[in-house]
């Protein structure tokens, strides 16, 4: 039976373009996972959008003399274009400034407040000494009072995992201007996390399939659980849905609270855009559906503790759709099944920093290099389980010595020879035991690679796919069909037929990782239709008349299936071209020079 799989992807913040470190953590792994499950025939809903509220966007707007909405509009388009060009197959990539998102966020706030899970507390708010604006917790750094780590943030210490408030930090400083923040008394609304402590602990304790760092970090976080502020003193954000705040512009819902709700609001928007307003329920109120969340390690607790607490408190909640059948009335919203957290990517041994020029933005990268080359590197050498470093030398080496030399070489030598000598899939003679064994080994890769992908072990899955491609290369080198054809055309045809069958199966195995080249290979092999695309943009008009663009795709029309090759004898091939480009080693010096130029 096909499964319902929700792929919930962290929302990139719309205060600037995204660099390759961002997509290494949230974008590429999620897309690989979603593509695999679609090929398996599962019902996938991959969702995200740009996170468009909060102080950082207002700071950019002030600097440029424009409005926060204008900044959000600009970077929503830039980020959306980048994700499209990288081939991230969202069912919907939307934004948090839509009327739909406001309505869903306010309904959840109101419901939690009415049930007593949102409380009011007097607290000390952090403000910038230079601008007077609220400083988000993550824009305040200082020394952790628990472990002494000197880059602890105002919400938590990434070194020891302690939950913090800005006032807890020793020598706190603003990341905006380096000055100590000014703390002023203010009233805020708080999510009463301790009310869910027992439920959360029991639930997380059962998630033995989570990555150990995610589970352990979450359990440690529960030890010091305390109410979490969900409002801030600012003008840019979702309005607080209580009567006394209807006409107030000085206090809004905190950006982190509305951002995680985006997973639900985006699902609801997708359903309405699809003409089936209740379709979201088959993912969110279906006990058999499984939810997978993808993000960087700095966002773990938002997805393992805070968002689950909100879902538990909301329960069956209100009614975001009509539900005419009454099937889902009283059915609670689904909790995460797995939270797939990536570590951090550095660049040339240093943290990414736009101000210091230590950065390569996605659009800049893709203007000079192929998307599949980046996707390959970020998977095979990315920060899946530990912090890793991107260097231009290693990127060029991986591209040339692995992607081009193994998979690219196999495809090129096979298709070029077959196209030249036969023009179509040749009729094979009797298969030898060696032939049969190779086909069986490659077909078995569908299970081994599939099992690894299903458990979010992307690096191991891609390594196994590359190993299988190398085995087919070894087979060709040993069988030498380019020599055999001179004396035994039938045997040569058989060898090339076996290679084509293996290449066709490997095409499917590589599709989640390398969708662009897999689609081209699909066409070179004489097939029609899409196995990996296309993506598209669509304009959506809301009830209030506003129009926004979403990234989407009609993935139901994909012809690819996670099955062994059924390549028909006699199918005409199309003239092949190399799948990948070999890079000149001078690229390394050129890119390092660009980085140096940005820094200066």
From Swiss-Prot:
ATP binds at residue 354. InterPro entries: Anticodon_Met, Met-tRNA_ligase_1, Met-tRNA_synth, Methionyl/Leucyl_tRNA_Synth, MetRS_core, MetRS_Zn, Rossmann-like_a/b/a_fold, tRNAsynth_Ia_anticodon-bd. Pfam families: Anticodon_3 (PF19303), tRNA-synt_1g (PF09334). It is an enzyme of class 6 (ligase). The keyword Cell cycle does not apply. GO terms for biological process: methionyl-tRNA aminoacylation. It is found in: Cytoplasm. Its EC number is 6.1.1.10. Keywords: Aminoacyl-tRNA synthetase, ATP-binding, Cytoplasm, Ligase, Metal-binding, Nucleotide-binding, Protein biosynthesis, Zinc. Zn(2+) binds at residues 144, 147, 157, 160. It catalyses: tRNA(Met) + L-methionine + ATP = L-methionyl-tRNA(Met) + AMP + diphosphate. Binds 1 zinc ion per subunit. A motif ('KMSKS' region) lies at residues 351-355. Its cofactor is Zn(2+). The keyword Amino-acid biosynthesis does not apply. It comes from the Bacteria. GO terms for cellular component: cytosol. A motif ('HIGH' region) lies at residues 12-22. Its main location: cytoplasm. HAMAP family: Met_tRNA_synth_type1. PANTHER family: METHIONINE--TRNA LIGASE, METHIONINE--TRNA LIGASE, CYTOPLASMIC. Monomer. Belongs to the class-I aminoacyl-tRNA synthetase family. MetG type 1 subfamily. Is required not only for elongation of protein synthesis but also for the initiation of all mRNA translation through initiator tRNA(fMet) aminoacylation. This is Methionine--tRNA ligase. It comes from Chloroflexus aurantiacus (strain ATCC 29366 / DSM 635 / J-10-fl). The gene is metG.
């Amino acid at each position: 039976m096909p499964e319902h799989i929700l792929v919930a992807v962290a929302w990139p913040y719309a205060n600037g373009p995204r660099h390759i470190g961002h997509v290494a953590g949230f974008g590429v792994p999620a897309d690989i996972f979603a593509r695999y499950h679609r090929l398996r025939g599962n019902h996938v809903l991959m969702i995200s959008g740009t996170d468009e509220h909060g102080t950082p966007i207002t700071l950019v707007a002030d600097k440029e003399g424009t409005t926060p909405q204008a900044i959000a509009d600009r970077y929503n388009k830039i980020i959306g274009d980048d994700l499209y060009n990288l081939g991230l197959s969202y069912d919907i990539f939307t934004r948090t400034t839509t009327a739909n998102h406001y309505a869903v966020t306010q309904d959840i706030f109101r419901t939690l407040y009415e049930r007593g899970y949102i409380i009011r507390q007097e607290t000390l708010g952090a403000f910038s000494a230079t601008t007077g604006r609220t400083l988000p917790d993550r824009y305040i750094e200082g020394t952790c009072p628990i472990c002494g780590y000197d880059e602890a943030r105002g919400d938590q210490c990434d070194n020891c995992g302690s939950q913090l408030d800005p006032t807890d930090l020793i020598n706190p400083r603003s990341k905006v201007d380096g000055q100590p923040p000014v703390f002023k008394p203010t009233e805020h609304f708080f999510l009463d996390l301790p009310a869910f402590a027992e439920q959360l602990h029991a639930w997380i304790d059962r998630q033995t399939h989570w990555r150990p760092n995610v589970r352990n970090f979450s359990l440690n976080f529960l030890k010091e659980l305390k109410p979490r502020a969900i409002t801030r003193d600012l003008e840019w954000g979702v309005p607080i849905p209580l009567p006394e705040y209807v006409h107030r512009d000085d206090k809004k819902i905190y950006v982190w609270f509305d951002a995680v709700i985006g997973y639900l609001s985006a699902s609801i928007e997708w359903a309405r855009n699809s003409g089936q307003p209740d379709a979201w329920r088959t993912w969110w109120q279906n006990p058999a559906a499984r939810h997978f969340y993808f993000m960087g390690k700095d966002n773990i607790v938002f997805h393992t503790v805070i968002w689950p607490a909100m879902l538990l408190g909301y329960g069956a909640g209100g009614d975001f759709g009509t539900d005419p059948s009454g099937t889902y009335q009283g059915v609670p919203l689904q909790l995460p099944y797995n939270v797939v957290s990536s570590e951090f990517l550095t660049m040339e041994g240093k943290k990414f920093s736009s101000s210091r020029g230590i950065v390569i933005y996605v659009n800049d990268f893709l203007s000079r290099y192929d998307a599949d080359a980046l996707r390959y590197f970020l998977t095979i050498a990315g920060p899946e389980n530990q912090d890793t470093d991107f260097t231009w030398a290693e990127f060029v080496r991986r591209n040339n010595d692995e992607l081009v030399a193994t998979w690219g070489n196999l495809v090129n030598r096979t298709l070029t020879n077959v196209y030249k000598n036969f023009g179509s899939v040749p009729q094979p003679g009797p298969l030898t035991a060696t032939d049969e064994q190779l086909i069986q080994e490659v077909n078995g890769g569908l299970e081994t690679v599939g099992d690894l992908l299903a458990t979010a072990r992307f690096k191991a899955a891609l390594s196994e796919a590359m190993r299988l491609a190398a085995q087919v290369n070894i087979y060709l080198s040993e069988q030498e069909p380019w020599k055999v054809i001179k004396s035994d055309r039938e045997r040569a045809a058989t060898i090339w037929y076996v290679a084509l069958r293996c290449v066709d199966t490997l095409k499917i195995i590589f599709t989640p990782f390398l969708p662009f080249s897999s689609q081209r290979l699909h066409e070179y092999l004489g097939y029609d239709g899409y196995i990996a695309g296309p993506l598209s943009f669509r304009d959506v008009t809301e009830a209030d008349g506003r129009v926004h663009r979403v990234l989407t795709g009609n993935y139901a029309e994909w012809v690819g299936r996670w099955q062994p090759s059924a390549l028909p004898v006699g199918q005409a091939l199309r003239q092949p071209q190399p799948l990948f480009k070999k890079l000149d080693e001078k690229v390394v010096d050129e890119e390092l020079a660009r980085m140096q130029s940005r820094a200066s």
